[in-house]
Amino acid sequence: MFEFLDRHPDFEAKLRAFKKRIVALEKKGKKLLTGNGKPCAKAKKKPAGNAEAAARKEALFQKQVRNNVNRIMKRTGWDFDSTREKMLATIERTGCTPTEFFLYRFYELTEEEQDTYYIAKYQKLFQKKYGTNKDFVSLLYDKERTNNYFAEYVRRPWCVNTKVSFEEFCETFKDTERVMYKPIAGHRGYGVEAIYLTPETMKDIYDRLVTYPEGVVEAFIKQHPEMCKLSPTSVNSLRFVTFSSNTVPVTPDGKMMDIAYSIVRFGREGSIVDNLHSGGMVANVDLETGCLATDGADRNGDLWVTHPDTGVTIKGFRIPYFEEAREMVKDAIATRKVEGYIGWDIAISENGPMLLEVNDRPGSDGLQTAPAQAKQGMKFLMEKYM
């Protein structure tokens, strides 16, 4: 009757589990977000005892240690105990996470080389120093509110699956061949689906979508032909990471807004998402030229001179409409008076840039994954904001 594309093999099971989780929360008087995107009064979680919370935190840490030690063992042939010992000693000295120890190849580096890396603990410093407004952060965790707030930059039809009639759905997507469903508070591409639309299947698709957890349904972006060379199935995106303030300079030379860096993310064959954590790849972008400044890298930290599926050479590839995308981010910060340490995800369509998402925790792995094999971190790039 109709075709849902690129669904994870366990999608139906995961969807059922997600719905059960929502029902369970609601029975306890809890809800993730109210209509204005803020936690409802009953949703406030009672703090667990210190011992219980510490035990959960320690269990999660040990799981991350085991997983990443095993990944290193497969790569190096080292034994478990010595690898774990080296990891824990480095974590104690630097404050890195087990995943950073693996991804940035800290097990191969001297202490001096390790100290060149911008690691997760510095993100917490930025979040504290630049203090993104809590109301703005709550907005970013609600895709409906984000799309409304930055409407002039979204530039594509969209709706909320639980708040649209069939007639409105048809009118919104009358000229659309495919749509994307995204959970309202989803992240890292989890739960995203691409769906073909035809006049004959419109009602069936609508009836199916309204049973999903609340989310946004957007017209699938027809990306620029040049971006398709990186991956034709995923919507490949630029990320700009910015620092901005309305009251104090964010750089030593007095700038109130600055773009720290940009990366591009692109998917693998058959995937509709480009996130590094969902199997995609990443490369750094030269902020002046819009050309890729590094080879590509995957979530294992392996480098690719050419894309393994399309064969295109990655380093030197020029992003179309890069200048327009960069200026769009600056304009959004200025017109919405955005403050804080923010990541902006931009797609490049045939007609120019479109805003995908805005993030208050843009991460550090995308910036340093590709340069990792050169044993040179990017802390030097971020020090002026510290």
Predicted regions and their residues:
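Phosphate-binding site of ATP-dependent enzymes
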Residues: T198-D295
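Protein kinase-like catalytic core scaffold
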Residues: V179, D258-A260, M354-L356
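Intrinsically disordered, low-structural-confidence terminal and linker regions
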Residues: M1-F61
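Short catalytic/ligand-binding loop motif for oxyanion handling, primarily in non-cytosolic enzymes
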Residues: E167, R188-G191, P249, G270-S271, ...
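Active-site nucleotide/adenylate-binding loops and adjacent lid/helix of ATP-dependent enzymes
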Residues: K129-L238, F243
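Conserved N-proximal alpha/beta basic substrate-recognition cap immediately N-terminal to
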Residues: E52-T172, V329
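A glycine-rich, aromatic-flanked flexible loop/lid motif
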Residues: E288-P308
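C-terminal active-site "lid" helix and adjoining low-complexity regulatory extension at the edge
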Residues: K45, K57, D302-K330, A334-Y341, ...
